[in-house]
Amino acid sequence: MADKEAAFDDAVEERVINEEYKIWKKNTPFLYDLVMTHALEWPSLTAQWLSDVTRPDGKDFSIHRLVLGTHTSDEQNHLVIASVQLPNDDAQFDASHYDSEKGEFGGFGSVSGKIEIEIKITHDGEVNRARYMPQNPCIIATKTPTSDVLVFDYTKHPSKPDPSGECNPNLRLRGHQKEGYGLSWNPNLSGNLLSASDDHTICLWDISAVPKEGKVVDAKTIFTGHTAVVEDVSWHLLHESLFGSVADDQKLMIWDTRSNNTSKPSHSVDAHTAEVNCLSFNPYSEFILATGSADKTVALWDLRNLKLKLHSFESHKDEIFQVQWSPHNETILASSGTDRRLNVWDLSKIGEEQSPEDAEDGPPELLFIHGGHTAKISDFSWNPNEPWVICSVSEDNIMQVWQMAENIYNDEDTEGGVDPEGQGS
């Protein structure tokens, strides 16, 4: 009986999701300046824009690259680098041109060939997360279903994977007992990599000190303050010795690598009422960070007074798994998760007055809801070179590259507000 009910619930949910998607699609020309939808061969659990951009002469597009991974059933997995063509601002755009088969608009010339897989490197098991080293973007670290963290220099691998299916990372980083997701390169100390694991620990490696012949590197330090699965870890963006971690023990911890005590953080906060899944430091304001949780909220913190939560962002209907500050705007951050939505928030709008109708759509700081995914969003990344462009990937193989309409974030004209999800009120 329960099985029948579950099947019925699933069917109803699927119908609702399809209905919502149709409404979203109908409204895309009003809500976006760009939407590209691409079905990957396998879902990617990870997405990160690389820092480089190519602007070919005489073309109305620029070429950007993404680090992705695969999560296959039983087939060979790969670390993937893809290229994406994005239209220049002056490209002739016709938002009414929406190819419903391809699911793309904001097209320029032909809409084909905008997203191409350039490099595939054989990987052991799915790629839980992949992040490039800021000082040398050819170096990419990955989290695997085993306890090892792998490091690849993609310039030392052929762009087509070895048919033998052998995974040959340039380094294997040892120290964990279990898998995990959190991974962070130090932006100020080249080669310093942090990793968070289900084994309740955080490992730190320094790969810049590795002898040329050694392929296996042991952790330099292991931090053991959390009492449950550590979900995410992130270096502070300005202070080379500070980092933050969040875990299923509902805590946010701030650590200093100069301290000799690896089992006690310099600060520990009961951050949420459920597991804390992600954190992000603000790139413009050295004291500000955000955490995202299974309690469906994003919390805002000030390192100078962690006892007091600055704000709680509430609109998600399920667990939040990723939070990222915009690289271009100090007050903008985005969050995503199980509810298939990516919310963009604007701190500067906290506390603004709202009409009762507007309040029904969400709090004033909720700038935009990206409703284009029909499955859980695994990861997303702000494009570092094109303001307001985001790439998001979901569990149903879909990757979307999109940019909200300029009139949404340039709100000189505040008359006639748009429901952020374009679903009417």
Curated annotation (Swiss-Prot):
Compartment(s) of residence: Nucleus; Chromosome, Telomere
Broad class of where this protein is predominantly found: nucleus
Database matches in SMART domains: WD40
Annotated WD repeat ranges: 32-125, 126-175, 176-223, 225-270, 271-314, 315-371, 372-404
GO biological process, one term: DNA replication-dependent chromatin assembly
Residues annotated with N-acetylalanine modification: 2
Transmembrane domains' residue ranges: none
GO cellular component: CAF-1 complex; chromosome, telomeric region; ESC/E(Z) complex; nucleus; NuRD complex
Entry superkingdom: Eukaryota
InterPro entries named in the record: G-protein_beta_WD-40_rep (IPR020472), Histone-bd_RBBP4-like_N (IPR022052), WD40/YVTN_repeat-like_dom_sf (IPR015943), WD40_repeat_CS (IPR019775), WD40_repeat_dom_sf (IPR036322), WD40_rpt (IPR001680), WD_repeat_RBAP46/RBAP48/MSI1 (IPR050459)
One GO molecular-function entry: histone binding
Alphabetical keyword list: Acetylation, Cell cycle, Chromatin regulator, Chromosome, DNA replication, Nucleus, Repeat, Repressor, Telomere, Transcription, Transcription regulation, WD repeat
PANTHER family: WD40 REPEAT FAMILY
Family: Belongs to the WD repeat RBAP46/RBAP48/MSI1 family.
Subunit structure: Binds directly to histone H4, probably via helix 1 of the histone fold, a region that is not accessible when histone H4 is in chromatin. Probably forms a large corepressor complex that contains ncor1, sin3a, hdac1-A and/or hdac1-B, hdac2, rbbp4-A and/or rbbp4-B and possibly rbbp7.
Task performed by this protein: Core histone-binding subunit that may target chromatin assembly factors, chromatin remodeling factors and histone deacetylases to their histone substrates in a manner that is regulated by nucleosomal DNA. Component of several complexes which regulate chromatin metabolism.
Name of the protein: Histone-binding protein RBBP4-A
Species this chain originates from: Xenopus laevis (African clawed frog)
Gene from which the chain derives: rbbp4-a
